[in-house]
A protein has these predicted regions:
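Hydrophobic transmembrane-helix bundles of small-molecule transporters
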Residues: 167-280
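12-transmembrane solute porter fold
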Residues: 14-31, 35-37, 264-431
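MFS-fold secondary transporters
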Residues: 94-99, 114, 188, 355-363, ...
Length: 531
């Protein structure tokens, strides 16, 4: 009998294999978070708008989400080592181009290619990890750790990149990512054998048409949600045309999938009631999770913190995520009711948002926000794995790939919707508050007069002339109005999110059939793209 050649060389110990995979997957995940690391620095370096920075991140996400279904064909065609090498080379080359370019369209194109390569590399790493985990108990822990890492990416990106951006230009981050890839890639290639994890299937009848249509749909959805508020939504022809194209292409994509013999996305998943509940909760979770950016904006614009100090405070969020990973994985192993776990998670998020409504102020000590940020991390970590594994377990095993792909679509949609909502509250709601404040700033308003006099006295006391002090005082009053508008906008947004969380908790409590889904992960593994 012929011995099967192992994936890794026999001399490589298990701790080295797992450690190497972790070293490889970390820069893959960090690559997504580069755009969120310091949006102002990115906009300043490339000479673009903040919405362009957001869209560069959305394009990356759209690439990994759309390539997910097609990626499996390349995975089974190439040997694992060869496929990994192609993915790493593509990511290094595209990172180098992003490092050198100043052209926005070039950045968009290569961020998309980068996303496709990232999907392949992450897929290999996740497959290698879960191929070595056999028991269902270990897989549940593996799920929790993997999705916990994804939740930590944003604060970790801030923590790692803030000192670099402070010392170098923004584009240096892409050079740093290249050097992060090299050690793990070299080490993994040196301990791997040239083997296949699946039977080789030739690359014939690859459904490129579905990939192109689906990628266009995702990019257009991201475009509308990222730029919609800036262009006043349907008042702008670009948004109207994009919405029309989305409807046509989405209908074409659905009809195509319904008529294909082997569709990349089987619409049959929507026949399962609990799956619909699962993807709805994923969508809500990503909107709520994105609301943390309002807190980051508050730290930066109201409290005047620099990115380094914000990153240090956000480390508390990582602590909360780690704690909740341990708790949620334990609850999954013990087969606790899924409704109970969800209520715990959404309840913690509700506590965070209502707490922050009362903490938002023009002056605050950084230590005040540590416990709330831990609570937010615990809420997000408590939900991420249980919601996703519930959705995947709600459908038969043959639909597992489609369930993951459609789940990624709803994550993408929730992510983009969160950006759109925050843009609305930052551009429209905040402007309304500024206008309302300015209506009351007149010479007849005693509060405004008193505030101006206070600024003048303070400036004159520091040696500024009376005439100059009057001009500066007007500017300080304008800044005070903007700060108050930012606070009111943040409070309004968190009030809406709190209301949404209350509704979701009530829905979960009133749906009895949720607990009928049996969580079974023995034959499944997480989707490689779940940012």
């Amino acid at each position: 009998m012929i011995a099967v050649k192992p994936v890794f060389k026999r001399w490589a110990p298990e701790w080295l294999i797992r450690g190497t995979i972790f070293i490889v997957i970390l820069p893959c995940l960090l690559l997504f978070g580069l755009s969120t690391a310091n949006p102002n620095a990115a906009a300043g370096y490339y000479g673009i708008e903040p919405a362009d920075v957001q869209y560069s991140m959305i394009i990356f996400y759209a690439a990994v989400a759309s390539f997910f279904a097609l990626e499996r064909r390349f995975f089974v065609y190439l040997a694992t080592k060869e496929y990994f090498l192609v993915g790493i080379i593509l990511q290094i080359v595209t990172s180098y181009i992003c490092y050198n370019t100043h052209n926005l369209h070039t950045l968009f194109i290569f961020r998309f290619i980068q996303g496709m390569a990232n999907c392949g590399t992450t897929s290999i790493c996740i497959t290698l990890i879960f191929s070595r985990i056999q028991s269902e108990r270990a897989r549940e822990i593996g799920y929790s750790i993997f999705y916990g890492m994804l939740l930590c990416i944003s604060p970790i990106s801030m923590l790692l990149t803030a000192p670099i951006v402070d010392a170098y230009d923004y584009n240096f981050l892409y050079k740093a990512i290249i050097f992060c890839y090299l050690p793990g890639a070299i080490l993994l290639l040196s301990i791997m054998n040239t083997v296949r994890l699946n039977r080789k299937i030739p690359l014939y009848q690859v459904d490129w048409a579905s990939f192109v249509i689906y990628a266009l749909v995702l990019c257009l959805i991201g475009y509308v949600l990222a730029y919609g508020q800036q262009y006043y939504w349907l008042q702008d022809k670009r948004i109207v045309r994009s919405c029309g194209a989305i409807l046509v292409l989405l209908l074409l994509h659905i009809l195509r999938q319904l008529n294909l013999k082997r569709p990349s996305q089987n619409m049959e998943v929507f026949k399962y009631r609990n799956y619909i509940v699962g993807v709805f909760l994923i969508f809500v979770l990503y909107i709520v999770r994105g609301a943390l950016n309002i807190t980051n904006l508050y730290f930066a614009t109201v409290l005047g913190m620099d990115p380094i100090h914000i990153a240090y405070i956000m480390a508390a969020n990582i602590v909360g995520i780690v704690i909740s990973i341990l708790i949620s994985s334990r609850l999954l192993i013990l087969k606790r009711p899924m409704r109970l776990i969800w209520i715990y998670g959404f309840g913690l998020l509700l506590i965070f948002h209502t707490w922050m409504i009362f903490l938002f102020n023009t002056q605050a000590d950084a230590s005040t926000f540590i416990i709330p940020l831990i609570v937010q991390g615990m809420g997000a970590g408590m939900l991420m794995t249980p919601v996703i594994v519930f959705a995947v377990s709600s459908v038969p095993e043959r639909l597992g790939g489609t369930a993951s792909a459609v789940g990624v679509f709803f994550r993408f949609l929730g992510f983009c919707s969160s950006i759109a909502l925050i843009n609305f509250y930052q551009l429209y709601n905040r402007t309304n508050h500024i206008n309302r404040f300015q209506e009351h700033i007149t010479s007849l308003n005693p509060v405004a007069v008193e505030k101006l006099e206070m600024y003048k006295r303070g400036l004159v006391g520091k040696g500024v002339s009376t005439g100059q002090a009057a001009k500066i005082a007007q500017g300080l009053l304008g800044r005070f109005i903007e700060t108050q508008a930012q606070l009111r906008s943040a409070i309004d947004y968190y009030t809406v999110i709190s209301g949404l969380l209350i509704v979701v908790i009530l829905i979960i409590a009133l749906i009895p059939y949720i607990n009928r889904t049996i969580i079974n992960l023995k034959s499944k593994q997480p989707a490689p793209i779940s940012y």
